[in-house]
Amino acid sequence: MVTRDQEEALTMADRIILMNKGVIEQEGSPQDIYSKPTTAFSANFIGTTNLFKAKKISSNSIEIHGSILECNDDIKDDVSTVTIRPEDIKISETGSEKNILKGTIKELEFLGSNIRGHIEVDFKSEKTNVICNFASEYILNNNIQNNSSVSISLQPHALKVVKA
């Protein structure tokens, strides 16, 4: 079956072949295409994601806009692209999580059981907008609003190194 409908492809397919300009970009199960993208195109094509240019610091650490972050992927190239899905970014309550960054809520979009947050994150060398998904109940119960200061965690297992 050939389709351009992402939802249809994810729900009906056992395997997906994702093509970009007539070339196979990635092939795999719907879960692999979503959670283990191999390229920035794949990550952006299925769902929403955050993409960052990153410099290799070691085989498991990267620098994004001057901030050093742990990453569970084995980093091979000196410069790469890193993706993280909005639902994998967590608000840090204790500060004990890895990869903690401070930011300011710029916009909250109520989507029913979820709220999409647009956060201006303070990396060391610049501020960057990041998209996050949170449970509505958590945001409402903790009185998090536009212009609230938050600490977020970019969890190491969720940072995926992809080809540009």
Task: Show the residue positions of the predicted features.
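Short acidic-hydrophobic catalytic motif
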Residues: 31-35, 43-46
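Short, glycine/charged-rich "phosphate-handling" switch motifs in NTP-dependent
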Residues: 15, 27, 36
